[in-house]
């Protein structure tokens, strides 16, 4: 009898242990996905979140994470689908629903569905208290719908709620993307009237002057930021020097940035590659881009990969540039500049094929050197 009882107790304990182990594994998978998302490893994060969804672990949260990963990877319709699935789950908290609606509106905007995005923005406005970020999102959606007055009203609300350098720059960039820089410049001018308080403020002021193409003031503000310990200011100073065609000074700034920065080195290598391209040293540019890609997270890769296309094009290696551009467009399908680059490369390759027709059947082919020797 005692043996049987002990056996039953052992069976229960083993079963509980197995259940705990299974739950622990699911928890670890989810936590690792969260870490990957925070670190910019979006493909790994997506895999982890999808595993969590399949295992019915934190389903709404996992669908949210998968949606964010897809959004960062450029799969905008996939992101919309994930956020929609998350919203359809039982017992989604009100705060999470707000978060999901905002993310879905962002994905819909990027997927070219501004009407759907505006519907979610209107739901947010009716069901929740609006904040600066939601006003800004609604302004971006209105801008995409050519509803300029509505966009302006929402941007004003956003800036009223959060009158800082970051918001001023975001509004400017939103207008700039639509070729309406003048509408955004007034926000830059407004924030420049505030007094800087620390190195970060001076750095942001320098960035703003750079956008306004006031390079002397940009240098002054960024130099102050650097003197106060801002490493980011060194990279921005490199951008300013490049804009002034001073590649030697720019190269020095980017090298100083690489020497001072411990983690985000990709930005420095990208800067050196830009200096190389400006100087016509395309092979060196490709070497620096390769170094940058090794150090880059997903967010930093885009500019490096685009500049890799440019370097191959400048080398007149149009076939490699075209192949790289095709890969790039799969990753960043909404990049209009890259789309134009791809079309140019396609036409350039077609032009080369017309200029160099294939030999007729049965015709011998010979190199230029062989032809020269025959003629001699």
Predicted stretch roles:
Residues 57, 91, 95, 129, ...:
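Short coil turns that delineate tetratricopeptide repeat
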Residues 38-39, 72, 110, 144-145, ...:
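Register position in tetratricopeptide repeats
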Residues 27-28, 61, 95-99, 133, ...:
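Start-of-helix register in tetratricopeptide repeats
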Residues 18-21:
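C-terminal motif of bacterial Sec signal peptides marking the signal peptidase cleavage site
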Residues 65, 72, 99-103, 136-137, ...:
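Canonical tetratricopeptide repeat
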